[in-house]
Amino acid sequence: MTYPNLLDRFLTYVKVNTRSDEHSTTTPSTQSQVDFATNVLIPEMKRVGLQNVYYLPNGFAIGTLPANDPSLTRKIGFISHMDTADFNAEGVNPQVIENYDGGVIELGNSGFKLDPADFKSLEKYPGQTLITTDGTTLLGADDKSGIAEIMTAIEYLTAHPEIKHCEIRVGFGPDEEIGVGANKFDAEDFDVDFAYTVDGGPLGELQYETFSAAGAELHFQGRNVHPGTAKGQMVNALQLAIDFHNQLPENDRPELTEGYQGFYHLMDVTGSVEEARASYIIRDFEKDAFEARKASMQSIADKMNAELGSYRVTLNLTDQYYNMKEVIEKDMTPITIAKAVMEDLGITPIIEPIRGGTDGSKISFMGIPTPNIFAGGENMHGRFEYVSLQTMERAVDTIIGIVAYKG
């Protein structure tokens, strides 16, 4: 189905810079997200028909569409995030390519282009309307496509009371891209049986498995002396960092793994001979493998300290989120419903693990099973990001189908 306000709504949203900041100590991490929620989203939530609309100190804008059929007793939530990834988001100037011809798309005057030879996903979209960047920013389809789709579904249901639906709760939240947005999510206030994050990629994505994730911060304490008289005295902290890294499995890196394979990912190294720091992220799907990865890093640190004869390697491990499959597989109702709705719409469900996490990873462990459904974005987090309007329309269809489902 086509929705006349969907495209303009999306274009309005992406032009607002809501980039999050991992170094911030506030919630949300940037004032622009507060402004977007209070000045743009909340007024529109009220206009499209949501009731009891409010903004929480945790950065979430919340609203409710009451059920219009007493036989539909479920309460279902839909959640999308306001922030965009760590890439230029100032001055987003989307291009709308109608009836895409399957060829190369020049991204404004930037010199960058979307070429099917480089981005095979384009082969799915001839004849469709694509929204791209101008090559100087990201687009923000992750996850403003999700926000636009949820808002459009509510607007349509309000205008069509003949479509009977259950109670719907909507939540638009901050800071998903920096991994802290759902930390303060109020599951008791949201009060639904289950929810969906509308934060996936291409048509048909339906996901209930994520990585389990941890961060590792390492400090290496060296001893700097003049290199000319260094023998037997110098301890080079940078060399310690190299030695630590070289003891990790060389093939367990993001660029060499896929599917259900986990990894260690070196994110940052800074320092000097005297002192160095390294940051890693650790990812795996199975709980035992995840715990083993953390234990392996600790073992390497302990071994190095023993060999050095002093405590020069310090490791701090922090769990970030866990594989939501552990929660959702106890009751697969949200997956069963979404799968049935997609199939009724002629959409082939793509049920694969997410090699990442969503807000649903944390919310599921707060007591609300929250799988993820497609929002349409491709090549997210950079200048080559784009989305199909037709896929966004199908996401709206899917949301409407889920809340009207009678099975």
From Swiss-Prot:
Catalytic center residues: D83, E176 (proton acceptor)
GO terms for MF: metallopeptidase activity; tripeptide aminopeptidase activity; zinc ion binding
Bilayer-spanning residue ranges: none
InterPro entries per UniProt: ArgE/DapE_CS (IPR001261), Bact_exopeptidase_dim_dom (IPR036264), Peptidase_M20 (IPR002933), Peptidase_M20_dimer (IPR011650), Peptidase_M20B (IPR010161)
Binding positions for Zn(2+) 1 per the UniProt entry: H81, D142, D199
Cofactor binding mode and count: Binds 2 Zn(2+) ions per subunit.
Catalytic activity: Release of the N-terminal residue from a tripeptide
Coiled coil: none
Origin: domain of life: Bacteria
Predominant localisation class: cytoplasm
PANTHER family: PEPTIDASE T
Name of this protein: Peptidase T
Organism annotation: Streptococcus pneumoniae (strain P1031)
Source lineage: Bacteria, Bacillati, Bacillota, Bacilli, Lactobacillales
